[in-house]
A protein has these predicted regions:
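Catalytic/RNA-binding core of pseudouridine synthases
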Residues: 1-160
Length: 160
């Protein structure tokens, strides 16, 4: 089976959680060896390759491209595609995690005008470099940044 699946990743699931769930479902659909032979003589079904093109942070929801079988060989092709992000923003506060889940470190009633918001948004059009938050799925020395941050480690991520 060679497929590309478009999955709406639920909040609090990691991208790997989605891959593992899809892999489990696909394995359960494989025909089982119903032989009355001994367990040692049963033939294991072939492994199913399942991967994803891109990672979403655990708190993010949205489209996750799941690749099955030979489609996994085209991961780089999917990773190079343009992406569009839709966000919801709460103005007037910051948190220690850079998201709505963390402890509020600053709260203000001084909300910018719609015109100020529009001018600020213009700074984010085109190719830009940003520093991802410490509580993100980016890997640092093989570990997810959010896991390091939750463990109290100082997480330094370079602009991308």
């Amino acid at each position: 089976m060679d497929k590309v699946l478009l999955i709406d990743k639920p909040k609090e699931w990691t991208s790997f959680d989605v891959v593992a769930k899809i892999r489990g479902i696909l394995r359960s659909l494989q025909p089982q060896n119903q032989s009355t032979e001994s367990v040692l003589e049963k033939v294991k079904p072939p492994k199913i390759r399942v991967g994803h093109a891109g990672t979403l942070d655990p708190l993010a929801t949205g489209l996750l491209v799941i690749l099955v079988g030979k489609a996994t060989k085209r991961q780089d092709d999917y990773m190079k595609k343009d992406k569009v992000y839709e966000v919801t923003v709460r103005l007037g506060s910051t948190s220690n995690t850079g998201d709505d889940e963390g402890e509020k470190t600053h709260v203000s009633d001084d909300i910018p005008s719609l015109d100020e918001v529009r001018k600020t948004i213009l700074q984010f059009i085109g190719k830009i470099h940003q520093i991802p938050p410490a509580y993100s799925a980016i890997k640092i020395d093989g570990q997810r940044a959010y896991k390091l941050a939750r463990a109290g480690k100082d997480v330094q991520i370079k602009p991308r």
